[in-house]
Amino acid sequence: MVTTWPKNFPGVGTTAEKIAQSINKASDGRLEIKVYGAGEIVPAYEVFDAVRQGTAEMGHGWSGYWISKNPGLAYFGGIPGGLSPSEQSAWAL
């Protein structure tokens, strides 16, 4: 998983590692996810393209970074009155 933040960056930078650990645990180790911080494989703002092109299998970032690729991503990037994190997770499922 490539991310848009440095590894261990407080808050959002540690979330990717927590997600990876949760998936590893939930799959009993069948799925092993290694987290790469911004710049380790691709620059921060190239995470979306890296996943789309197959350079990385997963990406973790803020959808607002990629509004130019799809304006609909703005709805998931923090618009006031938009979905809460819980609502967004429920919608995605």
Where in this protein do the model-derived segments appear?
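Glycine-/proline-rich flexible loop or hinge segments
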Residues: 3-4, 30-34, 74-77, 84
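Structural recognition of the beta-strand scaffold that forms the well-ordered cores
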Residues: 1, 33-35, 57-61
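Acidic helix-start/capping segments at beta-turn-to-alpha-helix junctions
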Residues: 36-50, 74
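Contiguous mixed-secondary-structure segments that line small-molecule binding/active-site clefts
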Residues: 17-24, 52, 57, 62-93
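A broad, structure-centric signal for solvent-exposed, well-ordered loop/edge residues
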Residues: 8, 42-43, 48, 83-86, ...
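Extracytoplasmic "Venus flytrap"
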Residues: 1-17, 38-42
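Short, polar/charged alpha-helical segment
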Residues: 9-32
